[in-house]
């Protein structure tokens, strides 16, 4: 009787353990999934021109940021993918923040105005750098006025 109880306990522990059985092993072993690189986050927004920054945040170079709108519905699918993603732009604001649009820094939960994201050259259109262009675009002017009016980091939460 004690041998059958011990055998039953061992079989029970094996059934509930996270061992890699032959039928469900990923290629390369059970640690292979952790070795994969960080991928680009899903595209979103009108014409798939933006990238997901969180489950309900979609930002793009020419779009600005959409929060909690129908354009962000696709971003919710990012939660179901097994590998992590990283959006473009340089780090800003909090530890997990990234420059999402000109003057906007987003993490997975919120976005804040950040003047450091204004100076990033990847967010300026080629027309702004042409020989005949001496003033800012209307969007940049509006963003600077908004930043001036808020005087600091105004946080927008969903």
Curated annotation (Swiss-Prot):
The modification Glycine amide is found at residue 28. Keywords: Amidation, Cleavage on pair of basic residues, Disulfide bond, Hormone, Secreted, Signal. GO terms for cellular component: extracellular space; secretory granule. Residues 1-19 form the signal peptide. It is found in: Secreted. Disulfide bonds join 20-25, 41-85, 44-58, 52-75, 59-65, 92-105, 99-117, 106-111. Seven disulfide bonds are present in neurophysin. One of its GO terms (molecular function) is neurohypophyseal hormone activity. Vasotocin is an antidiuretic hormone. Belongs to the vasopressin/oxytocin family. This is Vasotocin-neurophysin VT 2. It comes from Oncorhynchus keta (Chum salmon).
